[in-house]
Amino acid sequence: LVGSEMCIRDRCAEYFPGLMSRISGIGVSGVQKKAEEIHAAAWQGATGVLPMGGFYKSRKTGETHAWKAQTMHMMQTACDRASFDLWKQYSARMQSNPPIHLRDLLAVKPIGDPVPLEEVESITAIRRRFVTPGMSLGALSPEAHKTLNVAMNRIGAKSDSGEGGEDPAHFHPEPNGDNPSAKIKQVASGRFGVTAEYLNQCEELEIKVAQGAKPGEGGQLPGMKVTDLIARLRHSTKGVTLISPPPHHDIYSIEDLAQLIYDLKQINPRCKVTVKLVASSGVGTIAAGVAKAEADVILISGHNGGTGASPATSIKFAGLPWEMGLTEAHQVLAMNNLRDRITLRTDGGLRTGRDIIMAAMMGAEEFGIGTAALIAMGCIMVRQCQSNTCPVGVCTQNEELRSKFTGSADKVVNLITFYAQEVREILASIGARSLDEIIGRADLLGQVSRGAEHLDDLDLNPLLIRVDGADTVVYDRDRPRNTVPDTLDAEIVRDAARFLQDGEKMQLSYSVQNTHRTVGTRISSHIVTKFGMRNALQEDHLTIKLTGSAGQSLGAFAAPGLKLQVSGDANDYVGKGLSGGMIVVRPAMTSPLVAADNTIIGNTVLYGATDGHLFASGRAGERFGVRNSGAKAVVEGCGSNGCEYMTGGIAVIPVSYTHLTLPTKA
């Protein structure tokens, strides 16, 4: 709830338990007045005509939209002609809109006297702080997706692959030197396209816990957008709608999130891990837990956005402004001495250099530019991304419409350059020489009157708090990633040196305990790096024999050529993201237990698996095979919700008739 007086919040607590509001404002009389205005507009008599409204699509006499046709055209022309003068006209026009966002009610205070522009942080350095957020190949056309990657790589910035995986053909630079691969690879609840190879082709891995445009929902790709290419990359079937689960089925607590972060840092020993959160009340507490789970970057995503995988109702009615989530996360992290362990990033409607400055003052070090990047490539905001009928080839898989795509990497480079150039000029005007000088300086923001009672009643002070100790935080985006302890694989990698160097077939044996987590994952990273995913290794080229109880995530993302053989049992997440390896789990020879009657592997087995084999002499726990899209498995039973959201693979689960209760005749 945003912008209500205390009395309304107290009443809401009675009727809507758990509802929170950080921003106070309108009272009961204001609500009554608004209701009367809406009623009067709807009941104009027999001859009255209802207004068009313009809620979804911009109308001249309807609701104000930030992205008006003339404004978009001006920005596109600026990017096409590389004209900063036109960009400044666009920025001025955008800022002349009536107040739409919370930041529109704020003004920037100077640090001191203006400084010469040449003394300010360079455009090149500022550009590296920008990111194009996760927009999948599927939501976007292949041309648009590739263009964003190439553009951001040219300037040392980052693009995000989104949820749908990435074409392996893009993992290598093109003949002209352009790099079409995203530096950030996303891991979402559907785990589409997530393989050991994919996870090793990046500088950063992003766990999408939620999306600002549709918090609480998984990605949704209509069947008409699932082409042969999309189906191949996502390990699914052409023409079949793909819906990701609302939650990650391996994240039901902050400890589970810590385990996934650990898994990702094992499969890619070089990358940082980002956790994408949605702006919401209480996000600060979540951010503190994420920081303690050894994440490196936290993204606070605002409610704007959505590119064809978000229902229109969610885009309009769900989520909160990034200003609220970002300030809360920054404040809580600073209060708990966690802020200098994390890089904060935000996105969700950053349209001008002024927005970037305000986001920095609220605590952001990096900035996501999504919708504006699409507009620079030609998007005209017809708002039919989900229908596969984008007339300019940005958000469609229709080949005829894709041929109309006129975007280029140069246009996106110009866009990010203009953002950086405007930021640089504003920094000089307020007496700052770098963005680092103003990050977290919410005291440099002040609320201003907009001459409207319903706006001036809003109390934005919760956004403007500068907590004790915030002035001692050192903002270092280049710090090494937060380290995680080694697993048994550190020993395996040393012992398997001949296999990794010369491809020698080997068999290694170890005693395993439940404290040995993610066994087989680090060695899989080495296999993918050395031999590739489509290698000529035999399925048991490197066999690891384990005796005992294996910890969580046994064989996570196990690569082709690796066989893990356990005599004992294993905890949760066995074969998570299995990518071609083989896992065999059987009871110890001395075990008196009947295999078919007892659980031998834990919950959420084969979650997001894309290839490989699992054989378990015993039962699996809950959520077995959820989102399996290619692995073949044999188990002797499983708990509830088994094999849900599967798009491929085979699961054989023999059941003894002695376990069934057959109906009797009446």
Kindly give the residue locations of the regions a language model identified.
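Conserved small/polar residues in nucleotide/adenosyl-binding loops
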Residues: 1-10, 658-666
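Active-site capping/gating regions of soluble enzymes
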Residues: 4-41, 311-457
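Conserved, well-structured core domains of diverse proteins
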Residues: 4-232, 409-428, 432-542, 550-554, ...
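Short acidic, glycine/serine/threonine-rich loops at helix termini
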Residues: 4-9, 164, 171-175, 217-222, ...
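Glycine- and acidic
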Residues: 127-138, 239-248, 266-273, 307-316, ...
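Short hydrophobic alpha-helical runs that function as membrane-insertion/retention elements
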Residues: 159-162, 297-300, 366-369, 565, ...
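Alpha/beta enzyme core
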Residues: 199, 204, 212-345, 354-366, ...
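Long, distal/terminal scaffolding or interaction modules
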Residues: 473-660, 666
